[in-house]
A protein has these predicted regions:
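Conserved class I S-adenosyl-L-methionine
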Residues: 1-45, 59, 145-173, 180-184, 218
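A short acidic, Gly/Pro-enriched loop at the edge of an enzyme's catalytic core
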Residues: 106-115
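Core SAM-dependent methyltransferase catalytic element
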Residues: 207-209, 215-242, 246-249
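Class I SAM-dependent methyltransferase SAM/SAH-binding core
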Residues: 51, 57-103
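Short alpha-helix
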Residues: 191-207
């Protein structure tokens, strides 16, 4: 019951936080541009077919669809998916499923040019299964774009880092994200998994994804954006040891 209440409250607040929030909009545009460049490099026809594995209220899905791509959003939290569906315009090239990709198969596996995971691994109780799902959803040679926190989004340290890098105005602006995120994390509880670049690259390799590049991004570099390619594997990644994942904390 507490989890449902927290999710419903988060759904009501989330869009107000991200809509018109320049750092987040810049981040999503960067992800979209990266997908388009990778697809062009592979000489694949436009538009791209994209899966967002934990789409939340669908803000990323809608922005990608607005650029002309065909996008599927999946999320295990029903109130978030319901809000995403209500916000979706008729005729839009996107759709939403209330499923947990760690346990339920995404429609049309091995058909997506790109899979997007936005801040999923640090909170999901089974991150290894999420990475396996990303690989299964991709066409051969398709790309996984994984964004995850490399350190906690602590209000004071992150705002201070933004101030030092970008000035007072940007630091004050960052509070729009940091304060609601801190409140949500306090209400949600549970373990967290923060992955430095080398650790994330290792996990991607272990689950059939070849890292191609990585950048520290978003609010003073608290997040790691890594892009990778689906590897052909003679051994199914699902058979690999999931115990190699570091403990969430």
């Amino acid at each position: 019951m507490k989890g449902e209440w927290t999710a419903a409250a988060y759904a009501a607040l989330y869009d107000r936080v991200v809509d018109g929030f320049p750092p987040y909009e810049h981040l999503v545009d960067s992800v979209a541009g990266l997908i388009e460049r990778l697809n062009l490099k592979d000489r694949r026809p436009a538009p791209c077919r994209i899966l967002d594995v934990t789409c939340g209220t669908g803000s990323v899905v809608r922005r990608l669809a607005a650029r002309g791509h065909v996008v599927v959003g999946a999320d295990p939290i029903v109130p978030l998916v319901e809000r995403a569906r209500r916000a979706n315009r008729r005729g839009s090239s996107c759709c939403f499923y209330a499923i947990d990709v760690a346990h339920q198969e995404v429609p049309e596996i091995e058909s997506f040019d790109a899979v997007v995971s936005m801040h999923t691994l640090y909170w999901h109780p089974e991150p290894a299964r999420v990475l396996n799902a990303c690989r299964r959803a991709l066409r051969p040679g398709g790309h996984a774009i994984v964004l995850t926190y490399s350190r906690p989004a602590a209000v004071v340290p992150v705002a201070r880092a933004v101030w030092q890098a970008e000035g007072m105005r940007a630091a004050l602006q960052s509070l729009r994200w940091l304060i609601p995120t801190a409140a949500f994390e306090l209400a949600r509880g549970g373990p967290h998994l923060y992955l430095p670049p080398a650790e994330l690259a290792r996990l991607l390799c272990e689950h059939g994804l070849e890292p191609l590049g990585s950048d520290a991004v978003f609010l003073g570099g608290i997040s790691q954006l890594t892009w990778s390619r689906r590897l052909p594997c003679s051994t199914s990644p699902e058979t690999r040891r999931e115990s190699s994942l570091p403990r969430q904390r």
